[in-house]
A protein has these predicted regions:
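Short juxtamembrane and helix-loop transition motifs at transmembrane-helix boundaries
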Residues: 8-18, 42-48, 69-78, 105-111, ...
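C-terminal membrane-associated helical module and adjoining short loops/tails
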Residues: 1-11, 137-292
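Helix-coil boundary and interhelical linker segments in multi-pass alpha-helical membrane proteins
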Residues: 36-51, 87, 91-111, 154-177, ...
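Hydrophobic, membrane-inserted alpha-helices
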Residues: 32-35, 91-94, 212-220
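Alpha-helical transmembrane segments and their membrane-interface exit regions
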Residues: 57-62, 116-123, 187, 235-246
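C-terminal ends of transmembrane helices
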Residues: 65-74, 121-137, 142, 190-199
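Topogenic membrane-insertion module of multi-pass membrane proteins
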Residues: 1-61, 244, 292
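Multi-pass membrane catalytic core of lipid/isoprenoid biosynthesis enzymes
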Residues: 20-27, 69-127
Length: 292
Protein backbone atom coordinates (compact mmCIF):
# COMPACT_ATOMS: atom_id res chain seq x y z
CA UNK A 1 0.00 0.00 0.00
CA UNK A 2 2.77 2.43 0.93
CA UNK A 3 4.72 1.51 -2.22
CA UNK A 4 1.68 2.27 -4.38
CA UNK A 5 1.24 5.65 -2.70
CA UNK A 6 4.88 6.52 -3.30
CA UNK A 7 4.55 5.66 -6.96
CA UNK A 8 1.51 7.88 -7.25
CA UNK A 9 3.42 10.78 -5.71
CA UNK A 10 6.31 10.56 -8.19
CA UNK A 11 6.10 13.36 -10.80
CA UNK A 12 5.34 12.12 -14.27
CA UNK A 13 7.07 13.68 -17.26
CA UNK A 14 4.75 16.00 -19.10
CA UNK A 15 4.56 16.56 -22.83
CA UNK A 16 5.97 20.03 -22.22
CA UNK A 17 9.20 18.56 -20.87
CA UNK A 18 9.44 16.19 -23.82
CA UNK A 19 8.95 19.02 -26.32
CA UNK A 20 11.58 21.18 -24.60
CA UNK A 21 14.33 18.58 -25.00
CA UNK A 22 13.48 17.74 -28.62
CA UNK A 23 15.59 20.54 -30.21
CA UNK A 24 18.59 19.52 -28.09
CA UNK A 25 18.05 15.90 -29.11
CA UNK A 26 18.29 16.91 -32.78
CA UNK A 27 21.41 18.96 -31.97
CA UNK A 28 23.08 16.00 -30.28
CA UNK A 29 22.15 13.87 -33.28
CA UNK A 30 23.93 16.47 -35.38
CA UNK A 31 27.00 16.02 -33.17
CA UNK A 32 26.75 12.23 -33.51
CA UNK A 33 26.93 12.37 -37.30
CA UNK A 34 29.69 14.99 -37.22
CA UNK A 35 31.83 12.79 -35.00
CA UNK A 36 31.05 9.72 -37.09
CA UNK A 37 32.18 11.65 -40.17
CA UNK A 38 35.55 12.32 -38.52
CA UNK A 39 36.00 8.64 -37.69
CA UNK A 40 35.02 7.62 -41.23
CA UNK A 41 37.43 10.10 -42.81
CA UNK A 42 40.24 8.83 -40.58
CA UNK A 43 39.51 5.29 -41.79
CA UNK A 44 39.51 6.38 -45.45
CA UNK A 45 35.76 6.02 -46.02
CA UNK A 46 35.40 9.42 -47.66
CA UNK A 47 32.03 8.81 -49.28
CA UNK A 48 30.23 8.05 -46.03
CA UNK A 49 32.21 10.72 -44.20
CA UNK A 50 30.65 13.24 -46.57
CA UNK A 51 27.13 11.84 -46.29
CA UNK A 52 27.33 11.91 -42.49
CA UNK A 53 27.99 15.67 -42.68
CA UNK A 54 24.92 16.00 -44.90
CA UNK A 55 22.86 14.08 -42.33
CA UNK A 56 24.20 16.43 -39.65
CA UNK A 57 23.05 19.38 -41.77
CA UNK A 58 19.54 17.95 -42.03
CA UNK A 59 19.32 17.59 -38.25
CA UNK A 60 20.74 21.10 -37.82
CA UNK A 61 17.91 22.45 -39.96
CA UNK A 62 15.31 20.44 -38.06
CA UNK A 63 16.41 21.48 -34.56
CA UNK A 64 15.87 25.14 -35.40
CA UNK A 65 12.50 24.44 -37.00
CA UNK A 66 11.33 22.40 -34.01
CA UNK A 67 12.48 25.06 -31.56
CA UNK A 68 10.63 27.82 -33.44
CA UNK A 69 7.43 25.85 -33.98
CA UNK A 70 7.26 24.66 -30.37
CA UNK A 71 8.43 27.94 -28.87
CA UNK A 72 11.08 26.10 -26.83
CA UNK A 73 14.19 27.92 -28.03
CA UNK A 74 16.61 28.74 -25.21
CA UNK A 75 19.98 30.42 -24.87
CA UNK A 76 21.41 27.08 -23.81
CA UNK A 77 20.15 25.49 -27.02
CA UNK A 78 21.63 28.29 -29.13
CA UNK A 79 25.07 27.94 -27.56
CA UNK A 80 24.96 24.15 -27.80
CA UNK A 81 23.99 24.41 -31.46
CA UNK A 82 26.96 26.67 -32.22
CA UNK A 83 29.43 24.37 -30.48
CA UNK A 84 28.07 21.36 -32.35
CA UNK A 85 28.13 23.24 -35.67
CA UNK A 86 31.82 24.01 -35.16
CA UNK A 87 32.51 20.28 -35.02
CA UNK A 88 30.08 19.05 -37.68
CA UNK A 89 30.62 21.83 -40.24
CA UNK A 90 34.08 23.04 -39.28
CA UNK A 91 36.31 20.28 -37.96
CA UNK A 92 34.66 17.37 -39.80
CA UNK A 93 34.79 18.89 -43.34
CA UNK A 94 38.33 20.18 -42.75
CA UNK A 95 39.56 16.73 -41.69
CA UNK A 96 37.70 15.15 -44.60
CA UNK A 97 39.56 17.43 -47.02
CA UNK A 98 42.84 16.80 -45.20
CA UNK A 99 42.66 13.01 -45.37
CA UNK A 100 41.23 13.13 -48.90
CA UNK A 101 43.84 15.39 -50.49
CA UNK A 102 45.98 17.60 -48.26
CA UNK A 103 47.75 14.91 -46.22
CA UNK A 104 49.97 14.19 -49.23
CA UNK A 105 50.22 17.76 -50.48
CA UNK A 106 53.12 18.99 -48.37
CA UNK A 107 54.34 19.55 -44.86
CA UNK A 108 52.23 22.61 -44.12
CA UNK A 109 49.14 21.82 -46.20
CA UNK A 110 47.15 21.25 -43.00
CA UNK A 111 47.28 25.00 -42.32
CA UNK A 112 44.63 25.58 -44.99
CA UNK A 113 42.31 23.19 -43.14
CA UNK A 114 43.03 25.10 -39.93
CA UNK A 115 42.17 28.41 -41.63
CA UNK A 116 38.84 26.94 -42.69
CA UNK A 117 38.05 25.88 -39.10
CA UNK A 118 38.97 29.36 -37.84
CA UNK A 119 36.59 30.91 -40.39
CA UNK A 120 33.76 28.65 -39.18
CA UNK A 121 34.45 29.61 -35.55
CA UNK A 122 34.42 33.33 -36.40
CA UNK A 123 31.27 32.91 -38.48
CA UNK A 124 29.40 31.22 -35.63
CA UNK A 125 30.62 33.74 -33.04
CA UNK A 126 29.49 36.65 -35.20
CA UNK A 127 26.13 34.99 -35.80
CA UNK A 128 25.56 34.62 -32.05
CA UNK A 129 26.40 38.29 -31.46
CA UNK A 130 24.29 39.65 -34.33
CA UNK A 131 21.25 37.48 -33.64
CA UNK A 132 21.13 37.97 -29.87
CA UNK A 133 17.80 39.56 -28.96
CA UNK A 134 16.99 40.55 -32.55
CA UNK A 135 14.19 39.31 -34.81
CA UNK A 136 15.16 36.91 -37.55
CA UNK A 137 15.50 38.25 -41.08
CA UNK A 138 15.39 36.47 -44.41
CA UNK A 139 19.14 36.80 -45.01
CA UNK A 140 22.40 35.51 -43.57
CA UNK A 141 25.40 37.81 -43.24
CA UNK A 142 28.14 35.70 -44.73
CA UNK A 143 27.76 32.19 -46.09
CA UNK A 144 26.26 29.87 -43.45
CA UNK A 145 28.72 27.34 -42.06
CA UNK A 146 26.37 24.36 -42.64
CA UNK A 147 26.13 25.27 -46.34
CA UNK A 148 29.91 25.56 -46.64
CA UNK A 149 30.51 22.33 -44.73
CA UNK A 150 28.00 20.34 -46.74
CA UNK A 151 29.44 21.71 -49.97
CA UNK A 152 32.84 20.26 -49.07
CA UNK A 153 31.14 17.07 -47.89
CA UNK A 154 29.47 16.32 -51.22
CA UNK A 155 32.55 17.09 -53.30
CA UNK A 156 33.94 13.55 -53.10
CA UNK A 157 30.71 11.82 -54.21
CA UNK A 158 30.49 14.34 -57.07
CA UNK A 159 34.12 13.65 -58.07
CA UNK A 160 33.27 9.96 -58.52
CA UNK A 161 30.49 10.55 -61.06
CA UNK A 162 30.84 9.76 -64.74
CA UNK A 163 30.06 13.37 -65.60
CA UNK A 164 32.98 14.63 -63.51
CA UNK A 165 35.37 12.04 -64.91
CA UNK A 166 34.34 12.79 -68.49
CA UNK A 167 34.51 16.59 -68.24
CA UNK A 168 36.83 17.65 -65.42
CA UNK A 169 39.04 14.81 -64.29
CA UNK A 170 41.38 15.09 -67.29
CA UNK A 171 42.41 18.57 -66.13
CA UNK A 172 44.04 17.04 -63.01
CA UNK A 173 43.30 20.13 -60.94
CA UNK A 174 41.69 18.48 -57.94
CA UNK A 175 44.22 19.80 -55.43
CA UNK A 176 44.29 23.33 -56.85
CA UNK A 177 40.51 23.37 -57.10
CA UNK A 178 40.09 22.30 -53.48
CA UNK A 179 42.56 24.96 -52.33
CA UNK A 180 40.60 27.68 -54.13
CA UNK A 181 37.27 26.30 -52.93
CA UNK A 182 38.29 26.11 -49.26
CA UNK A 183 39.80 29.60 -49.29
CA UNK A 184 36.77 31.05 -51.04
CA UNK A 185 34.37 29.42 -48.59
CA UNK A 186 36.44 30.65 -45.64
CA UNK A 187 36.38 34.23 -46.96
CA UNK A 188 32.66 34.14 -47.75
CA UNK A 189 31.77 32.90 -44.26
CA UNK A 190 33.41 35.89 -42.57
CA UNK A 191 32.36 38.40 -45.26
CA UNK A 192 29.33 40.68 -45.37
CA UNK A 193 27.92 38.99 -48.47
CA UNK A 194 24.21 38.31 -48.00
CA UNK A 195 22.84 34.81 -48.54
CA UNK A 196 19.14 33.98 -48.49
CA UNK A 197 17.54 31.68 -45.98
CA UNK A 198 15.18 28.96 -47.13
CA UNK A 199 11.70 30.45 -47.59
CA UNK A 200 8.98 29.00 -45.35
CA UNK A 201 6.72 26.27 -46.67
CA UNK A 202 3.07 27.12 -47.33
CA UNK A 203 0.28 27.18 -49.87
CA UNK A 204 -1.46 30.46 -49.00
CA UNK A 205 1.15 32.90 -50.28
CA UNK A 206 3.57 33.19 -53.17
CA UNK A 207 6.53 32.96 -50.81
CA UNK A 208 5.14 29.83 -49.19
CA UNK A 209 4.58 28.18 -52.57
CA UNK A 210 8.13 29.15 -53.58
CA UNK A 211 9.46 27.60 -50.39
CA UNK A 212 7.49 24.42 -51.00
CA UNK A 213 8.81 24.22 -54.56
CA UNK A 214 12.42 24.74 -53.47
CA UNK A 215 12.17 22.10 -50.76
CA UNK A 216 10.56 19.59 -53.13
CA UNK A 217 13.24 20.16 -55.79
CA UNK A 218 16.04 19.68 -53.26
CA UNK A 219 14.32 16.60 -51.84
CA UNK A 220 13.80 15.13 -55.31
CA UNK A 221 17.38 15.78 -56.43
CA UNK A 222 18.85 14.67 -53.11
CA UNK A 223 17.02 11.33 -53.22
CA UNK A 224 17.30 10.33 -56.87
CA UNK A 225 20.64 11.88 -57.94
CA UNK A 226 22.52 13.20 -54.89
CA UNK A 227 26.00 12.77 -56.39
CA UNK A 228 25.09 14.80 -59.47
CA UNK A 229 22.77 17.33 -57.83
CA UNK A 230 24.04 18.52 -54.45
CA UNK A 231 27.52 19.84 -55.29
CA UNK A 232 26.35 21.91 -58.31
CA UNK A 233 23.52 23.20 -56.10
CA UNK A 234 26.11 24.36 -53.55
CA UNK A 235 28.09 26.09 -56.28
CA UNK A 236 24.93 27.85 -57.46
CA UNK A 237 24.12 29.02 -53.92
CA UNK A 238 27.67 30.28 -53.42
CA UNK A 239 27.67 32.11 -56.75
CA UNK A 240 24.26 33.68 -56.08
CA UNK A 241 25.55 35.65 -53.10
CA UNK A 242 28.62 36.83 -54.99
CA UNK A 243 26.70 37.87 -58.11
CA UNK A 244 23.96 39.60 -56.11
CA UNK A 245 26.46 41.59 -54.06
CA UNK A 246 28.42 42.58 -57.18
CA UNK A 247 25.31 43.70 -59.08
CA UNK A 248 23.97 45.71 -56.14
CA UNK A 249 27.38 47.32 -55.69
CA UNK A 250 27.46 48.40 -59.34
CA UNK A 251 23.90 49.74 -59.18
CA UNK A 252 24.55 51.92 -56.15
CA UNK A 253 25.16 55.60 -56.91
CA UNK A 254 26.16 58.30 -54.42
CA UNK A 255 23.27 60.61 -53.68
CA UNK A 256 23.76 64.40 -53.80
CA UNK A 257 24.48 65.89 -50.39
CA UNK A 258 22.83 69.15 -49.39
CA UNK A 259 24.34 71.41 -46.73
CA UNK A 260 22.41 74.58 -45.76
CA UNK A 261 20.46 74.50 -49.01
CA UNK A 262 23.58 74.25 -51.20
CA UNK A 263 24.67 71.19 -53.17
CA UNK A 264 28.13 70.06 -52.26
CA UNK A 265 30.44 69.75 -55.25
CA UNK A 266 31.29 66.26 -56.36
CA UNK A 267 34.97 65.63 -57.04
CA UNK A 268 33.99 63.74 -60.19
CA UNK A 269 31.60 66.45 -61.49
CA UNK A 270 33.63 69.40 -62.90
CA UNK A 271 30.46 71.34 -63.83
CA UNK A 272 29.63 72.12 -60.19
CA UNK A 273 31.36 75.00 -58.40
CA UNK A 274 33.38 74.14 -55.31
CA UNK A 275 31.59 74.63 -51.99
CA UNK A 276 32.14 77.72 -49.92
CA UNK A 277 34.50 77.33 -47.03
CA UNK A 278 33.20 77.81 -43.50
CA UNK A 279 34.86 81.19 -43.17
CA UNK A 280 33.57 82.48 -46.54
CA UNK A 281 30.05 81.20 -45.80
CA UNK A 282 30.06 83.01 -42.44
CA UNK A 283 31.11 86.33 -44.02
CA UNK A 284 28.60 85.89 -46.83
CA UNK A 285 25.87 85.32 -44.27
CA UNK A 286 26.93 88.42 -42.36
CA UNK A 287 26.67 90.56 -45.50
CA UNK A 288 23.19 89.24 -46.24
CA UNK A 289 22.04 90.18 -42.77
CA UNK A 290 23.29 93.80 -42.97
CA UNK A 291 20.51 96.45 -43.46
CA UNK A 292 20.38 98.08 -46.85
Amino acid sequence: MELRQRRERLPRPSMRHVVVVMPSAFTLGNLFFGFWSIVSAFNGNFRWAGWFIVFAGILDMLDGRVARLSGTGTRFGEQLDSLVDLISFGVAPALLMYFLDFSNAGRFAWILCYIYVVAVALRLARFNVLSAGKPSTGWFTGMPSPSAGMMLAVYYPFSQTNWYRASLAYMDLQHEGLVVLMLLLAVLMVSNVKYPKFPPIGVRSARGILGLTVHLLILFGGIFAPEYFLFPLGLLYMAFGLVRTTVLGLMERPEPVTVIGERVADAHDPTLPPPLSHERRRHSGDRRQEPE
